[in-house]
């Protein structure tokens, strides 16, 4: 189908779903009649050409799954994934045969997803959008990206997503998450489902969750909340049709003198029909005056009749209906009218329109659009919606509905009584709130919003995916260093020039690599070279390691700065809120005490928990728990942000990053050294977190101008005063060939170059120090 994006460009949309919106009926020996329908399994395995031809006229393309269908659909999709996603857990009968069955179903599920891919490949054209629907197609995003990583791929889950504690029981938990994360956009009906998904990815895959989504393979997979809607105008218009008005009048005559409670559900375990009947029974028990004035009409659409569990549910429901009607009914009147069938759309709208109360008691529901349909048909009646708090619609329509816990039959009974006795003014107010929502959050808007988000997410993802940089050309680094007149070397501390920690017997204190002591001293003593150590560590740690050198130290990501011959000054804003720090220290201590060989650093503006020297798997598990705890509460309203490193979890004040402080640091250095010669060479290397990698691009903008007249402003303060200085001079005269930004051990980075480990940086620094003292002429490299 076609789609016009926000720029007015026409794009082709491929909606991929387990069910086509059509039902088929044979009209001849080789012909079929197809009608658009709201759902229903469509799996014709014969006469493929005839069916495909008829479907093509409706812009539908079938995928014939043949022998894998039962294992894929009834087996893995509905037998394993569906119960997990709806908080029901895996089947309890677990033996060797069950395990083999799981494996067979899992293979069929992957094969079916491959078959969907094959059909997409036959129909896809460059620029098309592919929108994957629901849990039946969790492998499809990965398969699509493997086929062509330029395809715009979105995935929407129509069911709930469970907590990580439930999801992690799934044997194929990691593979499914990774496959879904290949999509450019992932969307859910509610914030709870999205939060569960992000937390699950964090706990199981060890990836970082952000307010935008999940950081995975060098990019952010965007996660959004877009609750689906209906086509409200269709229902409003249907209620005004003459034949529907006639049906409404017939229903009013049939139930004359009675209040009508309506239930419309699939006969399914999650729909809570038994709980609905138990709540209704309690209401009749406690309110005898209502027994001959009320009727509950329940439409229970049959589903999966071949499954034993569903047969048991049907029998249970029928027993409840018989018991309640036997207790409270009479020859002329029954309190429950139970219908084991579906009804046509006109009759359904008539029922919606004449009902006084809609009763939805889902035990777990992705959304429940029945509640939306009821609201759309209630322009005249202003009936009351009683809605389960476990239905996704509860987060959208909760303001105008009576929310209930369906497991609490007393609460359901009380809600029925309140709804029946509710004054018209309150009913009017509640209806107005929900009607406005249903009208403005239609299915059209849902689709448009999803596709707009997908286009935006894809464009952003393209920007995030960076080219793998080249290996650092060490000979060029050395030669350019020797030819320059004013050099700036910026080094990270942890993971860059710290002592390697390969042995469990070593101490965990951060120490300067002993191989660097003489090298660093030689570089720092060179009048043409300025060395800066930029670290997230606190002032005490840097003082302890670098007190004997003539070096510039920037602690806590540049919040504090000093030359080792002077006192610390601060760049920290005066109004920075640090109230959260003391409260989190106990949290970090808790995880440190329970994770052997982990440690945490507490500084004025940040807390860092490090588990590099702990057991890796246990450390990752503890880090996931710590992250989940932090995001759930302690910093939710604090002026702080959480950042996950490879072996660390850091919480720091908002705005504390390395890149913004480089300008302040440069200004301070220029002022203190009274520089008259512009900096013409920069070597910047570190094992930096992704959030700090903008430090590499800081100098890129300066390179655009061969010689930049630079006004640098820096703030300096001691404990007694703060001072703002303004320095105006040619700070930088930096050419492309004289700038070497270098990341350590990272394939995806904003740096120009990479090296495998800190050992490479140590060796290079030694060669630079030697280049200072050599008398051999240096040949200018080719550029």
From Swiss-Prot:
Enzyme Commission number(s) of this protein: 2.4.1.15
Region (Glycosyltransferase) location: 11-456
Pfam families on file: Glyco_transf_20, Trehalose_PPase
Class in the EC hierarchy, top level: transferase
Keywords: Glycosyltransferase, Transferase
InterPro entries attached to this UniProt entry: Glyco_trans_20, HAD-like_sf, Trehalose_PPase
GO terms, biological process: trehalose biosynthetic process
GO MF terms held by the record: alpha,alpha-trehalose-phosphate synthase (UDP-forming) activity
Gene3D superfamilies, per the entry: Glycogen Phosphorylase B
Reaction(s) catalysed by this chain's protein: D-glucose 6-phosphate + UDP-alpha-D-glucose = alpha,alpha-trehalose 6-phosphate + UDP + H(+)
Family to which this protein belongs: In the N-terminal section; belongs to the glycosyltransferase 20 family.
PANTHER family: ALPHA,ALPHA-TREHALOSE-PHOSPHATE SYNTHASE [UDP-FORMING] 3-RELATED (PTHR10788:SF83), TREHALOSE-6-PHOSPHATE SYNTHASE (PTHR10788)
Protein name (database record): Probable alpha,alpha-trehalose-phosphate synthase [UDP-forming] 3
Organism of derivation: Arabidopsis thaliana
């Amino acid at each position: 189908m076609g789609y016009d994006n926000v720029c007015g460009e026409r794009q082709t949309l491929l909606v991929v779903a387990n069910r086509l919106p059509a039902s088929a009926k044979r009209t001849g020996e080789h012909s079929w009649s197809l009608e658009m329908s709201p759902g229903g399994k469509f799996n014709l395995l014969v006469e493929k050409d005839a069916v495909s031809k008829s479907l093509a006229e409706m812009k539908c393309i079938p995928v014939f799954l043949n022998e894998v269908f039962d294992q894929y659909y009834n087996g893995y999709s509905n037998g394993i994934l569906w119960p997990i996603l709806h908080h029901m857990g895996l089947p309890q009968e677990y033996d060797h045969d069950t395990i083999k069955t799981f494996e067979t179903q899992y293979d069929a599920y992957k094969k079916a997803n491959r078959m969907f891919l094959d059909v997409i490949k036959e129909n896809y054209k460059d620029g098309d959008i592919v929108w994957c629907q629901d849990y039946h197609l969790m492998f499809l995003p990965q398969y699509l990206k493997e086929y062509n990583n330029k395809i715009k791929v979105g995935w929407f889950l129509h069911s709930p997503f469970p907590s990580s504690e439930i999801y992690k029981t799934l044997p194929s938990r990691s593979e499914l998450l990774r496959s879904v994360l290949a999509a450019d956009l992932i969307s859910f009906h509610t914030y709870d489902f999205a939060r569960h998904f992000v937390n699950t990815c964090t706990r199981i895959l060890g990836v970082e969750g952000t307010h935008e989504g999940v950081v995975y393979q060098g990019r952010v997979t965007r996660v959004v909340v877009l609750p689906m809607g209906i086509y409200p105008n269709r229902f409003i218009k249907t209620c005004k049709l003459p034949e529907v008005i006639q049906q409404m009048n017939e229903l009013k005559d049939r139930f004359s003198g009675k209040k009508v409670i309506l239930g419309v559900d699939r006969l399914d375990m999650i729909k809570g029909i038994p709980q609905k009947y138990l709540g209704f029974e309690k209401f009749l028990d406690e309110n005898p005056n209502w027994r001959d004035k009320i009727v509950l009409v329940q439409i229970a659409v049959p589903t999966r009749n071949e499954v034993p569990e569903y047969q048991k549910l049907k029998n249970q429901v029928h027993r409840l209906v018989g018991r309640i009607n036997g207790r409270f009914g009479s020859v002329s009147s029954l309190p429950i009218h139970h219908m084991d069938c579906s009804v046509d759309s006109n009759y359904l709208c008539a029922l919606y329109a004449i009902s006084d109360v809609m009763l939805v008691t889902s035990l777990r529901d992705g959304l429940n659009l029945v509640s939306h349909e009821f609201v759309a048909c209630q322009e005249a009646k202003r009936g009351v919606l009683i809605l389960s708090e476990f239905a996704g619609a509860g987060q959208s329509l909760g303001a105008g509905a009576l929310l209930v816990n369906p497991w609490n039959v007393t609460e359901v009974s009380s809600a029925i009584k309140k709804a029946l006795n509710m004054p018209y003014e309150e009913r009017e107010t509640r209806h107005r709130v929900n009607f406005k929502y249903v009208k403005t959050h239609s299915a059209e808007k849902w689709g448009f919003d999803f596709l707009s988000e997908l286009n935006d997410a894809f464009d952003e993802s393209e920007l995030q995916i960076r080219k793998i940089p080249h290996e650092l050309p060490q000979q060029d680094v050395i030669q350019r260093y020797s030819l320059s007149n004013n050099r700036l070397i910026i080094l990270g501390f942890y993971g860059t020039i710290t002592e390697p920690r390969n042995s469990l017997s070593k101490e965990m204190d951060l120490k300067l690599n002993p191989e660097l002591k003489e090298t660093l001293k030689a570089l720092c003593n060179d009048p043409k070279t300025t060395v800066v150590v930029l670290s997230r560590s606190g002032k005490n740690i840097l003082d302890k390691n670098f007190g004997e050198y003539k070096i510039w130290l920037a602690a806590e990501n540049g919040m504090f700065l000093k030359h080792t011959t002077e006192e610390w000054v601060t760049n920290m804003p005066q109004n920075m809120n640090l109230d959260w720090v003391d409260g989190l220290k106990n949290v970090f201590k808790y995880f440190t005490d329970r994770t052997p060989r982990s440690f945490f650093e507490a500084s004025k503006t940040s807390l860092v928990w490090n588990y590099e020297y702990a057991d890796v798997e246990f450390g990752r598990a503890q880090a996931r728990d710590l992250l989940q705890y932090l995001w759930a509460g302690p910093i939710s309203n604090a002026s702080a942000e959480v950042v996950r490193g490879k072996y660390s979890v850091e919480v720091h004040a908002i705005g504390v990053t390395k890149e913004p402080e480089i300008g302040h640091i440069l200004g301070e250095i220029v002022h203190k050294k009274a520089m008259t010669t512009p900096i013409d060479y920069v070597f910047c290397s570190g094992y930096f977190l992704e959030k700090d990698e903008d430090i590499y691009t800081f100098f890129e903008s300066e390179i655009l101008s061969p010689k930049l007249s630079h006004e640098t402003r820096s703030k300096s303060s001691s404990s007694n005063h703060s001072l703002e200085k303004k320095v105006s001079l040619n700070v930088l005269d930096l050419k492309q060939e004289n700038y070497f930004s270098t990341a350590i051990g990272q394939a995806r980075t904003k740096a120009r170059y990479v090296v495998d480990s800190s050992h490479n940086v140590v060796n290079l620094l030694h060669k630079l120090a030697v280049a200072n003292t050599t008398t051999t002429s240096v040949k200018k490299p080719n550029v």
